[in-house]
Curated annotation (Swiss-Prot):
GO terms for molecular function: 2 iron, 2 sulfur cluster binding; dihydroxy-acid dehydratase activity; magnesium ion binding. Mg(2+) binds at residues 81, 123-124, 491. It comes from the Bacteria. Keywords: 2Fe-2S, Amino-acid biosynthesis, Branched-chain amino acid biosynthesis, Iron, Iron-sulfur, Lyase, Magnesium, Metal-binding. The active site is at 517 (proton acceptor). Pathway: Amino-acid biosynthesis; L-isoleucine biosynthesis; L-isoleucine from 2-oxobutanoate: step 3/4; Amino-acid biosynthesis; L-valine biosynthesis; L-valine from pyruvate: step 3/4. Its EC number is 4.2.1.9. [2Fe-2S] cluster binds at residues 122, 195. It catalyses: (2R)-2,3-dihydroxy-3-methylbutanoate = 3-methyl-2-oxobutanoate + H2O; (2R,3R)-2,3-dihydroxy-3-methylpentanoate = (S)-3-methyl-2-oxopentanoate + H2O. This is Dihydroxy-acid dehydratase. The keyword Magnesium applies. GO terms for biological process: isoleucine biosynthetic process; L-valine biosynthetic process.
Amino acid sequence: MPAYRSRTTTHGRNMAGARGLWRATGMKDSDFGKPIIAVVNSFTQFVPGHVHLKDLGQLVAREIEAAGGVAKEFNTIAVDDGIAMGHDGMLYSLPSREIIADSVEYMVNAHCADAMVCISNCDKITPGMLMAALRLNIPAVFVSGGPMEAGKVVLHGKKHALDLVDAMVAAADDSVSDEDVKVIERSACPTCGSCSGMFTANSMNCLTEALGLSLPGNGSTLATHADRKRLFVEAGHLVVDLARRYYEQEDERILPRSVASKKAFENAMALDIAMGGSTNTVLHILAAAYEGEVDFTMDDIDRLSRKVPCLSKVAPAKSDVHMEDVHRAGGIMSILGELEKGGLINRDCPTVHSETIGDAIDRWDITRTSSETVRNFFRAAPGGIPTQVAFSQEARWDDLDTDREKGVIRSVEHPFSKDGGLAVLKGNIALDGCIVKTAGVDESILKFSGPARVFESQDASVKAILGNEIKAGDVVVIRYEGPKGGPGMQEMLYPTSYLKSKGLGKACALITDGRFSGGTSGLSIGHVSPEAANGGTIGLVREGDIIDIDIPNRTISLRVDEAELATRRAEQDAKGWQPAEQRKRRVTTALKAYAAFATSADRGAVRDLGDR
């Protein structure tokens, strides 16, 4: 039977000093011997998705102690990708994922915690904590802060549902008046919570449900709704139960690596493809699998993308549908339920809350459950009142969206498309693959060919787009923005948003070794691997070269013969794989440290220390 890890610091005469320090934190004689549970919070006033988390850590802590554990809270950092967007701040976003994972490991191992509750929400925080959980492999439960309500505004007599991306697009569209931009800006992000579309934060919180590490409803229950409080209360009790099951009953089925098995990763990726999740999830799923020593690669994603249909389209793919609408349609368990009916889910994977994910689907899918409690849970609606307070409203929809033919969630017989919402493309420009969010691509441009417009940085591309230098039919190529080349693999939300503002969203393509915001739509192809800084072919593209993109056949090719590419490669080897133009970019020691070990996107942009 495994001993509680915390006994290392709480038992024995030689630990008198450590016990003295524990007592100074409030522990009493009766607490020594109880499981010590780390409450891993990520509160910050910088991020709307985390601004309401300050008191939620202590809410969980009280429930842990009521269940017989000892709760000890600490905080990680949290970067707001939207605020960091469009300037050098974005260089820090992806590297912060590794810092978060490391900081959780440092705190939990240094203090010998027995288990943990991870309170995350936004883009890199959930992935960082997930990586840590799989690295540590101690009992863990995830509970996120929840999605923001969608913005609502009436413009020129017409009602619109809004999100962050609408504000960005409107600001760059010269046809939108200053007054309308102000109205959109003030309405786009009305409450606390992660941005309201199927962007990276919400995508990742949904995937923790599919992995089996969070409670049903975690990905879709609004941050403002009173129903979300139950998830935090249950997480506190659940984690103590999991700790006892592992340390006292030797039940290893509840450990993160047992729950998040290869089959569970397949379930999560099937969900991601079906719901048209952010392309960033591919990076994070690969990185999490790496930490858990799960053999899950781009080839697995490619295999799944060829058989899983797109069952839901949410903003940015469908601008009038947001997470509150997904919840009304039954949330993640109902999407998994539709996949399961099509034989696309592994039912036998264990979860932290149910014997198997199949059992959870049977109870929580609104099209098959007999529980009125479950159905009422998914009636939780937006309150429509701007607020930064969690659990502050109790609005309910009058009815649920159970229309699986034309509703927000479709059946496998009535998909939005037979091809899923994400696809892996390969070809001479991306030998190790690249990713496109097909759910956001108009059918008219699933096949596209055009001349390359080459830029050595995101900034240069933005200048050209806003300067009307990009024309319909062009393929915008942004390189040296990968994990190593950036460094930090910036998101390209501004270039894609500005293309849309210029009326080119369905007339141009954009490819990059960088990545995209979950708010990106259009023919935006990212994660090109190998990246330019690692000698990838994207570094050999020249102005005017024709690039062919064929999403149905999963190919992307540079129309240049092998002999010419070999000549260009020899020339580039001599020059060194770095931008041809000097960039005004301050790369600090911290960023250099990340770049020194960063791998390309096909490996999740994890650090390669040469130990595997």
